[in-house]
Amino acid sequence: FDANRGFFLNGKHLKIKGTNNHQDHAGVGVAMPDGLQDFRIKTLKSFGSNAYRCSHNPPTPELLDACDRLGMLVIDETRLMGITSTQLSELKRMMLRDRNHPSIISWSIANEEWGIEGDIKGARMTRTIQDYAKTIDTTRGITAGISGNWDNGIATAVDVVGYNYIKHGGKETTDKHHREFPNLASWGTEEGSTFATRGIYFEDNEKQYKPAYDLPQSANAHSIEQGWKHYDSRDYLAGMFIW
């Protein structure tokens, strides 16, 4: 990661075009056969995606195996941010289990920790966790998904700032933060909170149909297209993960 030029893979610049993913699939739940892991990653790649965020827990090892084989980059994410012995042990177990997977480009230590993400406690905890993580693996940047309060707390301390829904603070949010913290790399860990029903192009709330037109459904979120235009037009932003 480069704070001004984004992300580089094997020395070549690459814009991250990622997705957030829970570990479940229609019809089978979370206990997926290995072949379905391959199918999901191949399908995402066919859409043009090159990165996969494990939201919001460590994935099954078979998913990481598929990403290694097929060339999908990964954010590996711990379940709960914290500095207790139990929480640090969970982070350590994840990192020791997964660190030999070449697909992993970043460890995520948090997602939308609203109670602490915007204050000094969050910043101190981030530094403690980050320092601990680097005793296990120094080759990857630490990130966190942050949903606001980017001027304080976690966003002032983490290696790679993760913006969740920049509409919270206006489109100039990332530019302002980059000016104030020019040494921190950054990307969009969640953007584009759009709801759609496949093959449906009209709205019917009684049937819970939503038109498949990439329309923003929240006052706090852009459409995927709006979000991507922002992240793609700024060299310092490594890329974006669709929610």
What are the roles of these predicted feature ranges?
Residues P102-I105, N111, G148-H168:
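Aromatic- and acid-rich polysaccharide-binding/catalytic face
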Residues H56-P58, M81-Q87, W150-N152, N164-E172:
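Acidic-and-aromatic substrate-binding clefts and catalytic sites of carbohydrate-active enzymes
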Residues K42-A51, N152-V160, P211:
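Short, surface-exposed connector motifs at secondary-structure boundaries
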Residues F1-D131, I142-T143:
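Active-site-adjacent substrate/metal-binding segments within catalytic domains
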Residues I105-W107, R124-T135, T143, I154-A155, ...:
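Substrate-binding clefts and catalytic carboxylate motifs of secreted carbohydrate-active enzymes
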Residues L70-L73, R93-M95, V158-G162, E203-K207:
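Short, hinge-like loop/turn segments at secondary-structure boundaries
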Residues D76, N111, V158, T189-E190:
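Active-site flanking residues adjacent to catalytic metal/cofactor-binding acidic residues
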Residues R79-L80, A110-W114, T138, S147-G148, ...:
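Catalytic metal-binding/acid-base residues of hydrolase active sites
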